[in-house]
Amino acid sequence: EGGPLDAGTVMFTDFTLRGTWMAATDSGTFHDFTFTPGVSIIVSCRDQEEIDRYWAGLSAVPEAERCGWCVDRLGVSWQIVPYNIAELMANAATRDKILHMGKIDLTKL
C-alpha cells in the first residue's frame, strides 16, 4: 500500500527455494523489454534424475535448448547442469559432447 503500483502488487519478495535464499523485485514503471539469455539462472543438479525433473518443468522453447540451457514459458533462460559442470567442460571430448546436446544426458558422456 502507498507505493507506485496497484494495491496487492508485489514490489519485493524473498523466498527459499530448495534451501537457497532467493529474492525478486519489480519496477514501479513499465519497461518495454523482455528477458534475454544475457541473464540466466543456474540449477546445479546432483544426478540425471534431477536434470530430467527440472528440464521437464522448465523447458518451454525447444528451439532454445542448447548445451544444458533452456527457456521457460516466461522467456527466462535456465542452465540445468550437473554439479560438476566445470570439471566436465575441462575435458575436450566431454565438452564437445555437451556442446552438441540440448538437455545434458550424463549417460552419453
Please state what every model-predicted region is:
Residues 10, 36-38, 95:
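A structure-centric signal for secondary-structure junctions around beta-strands
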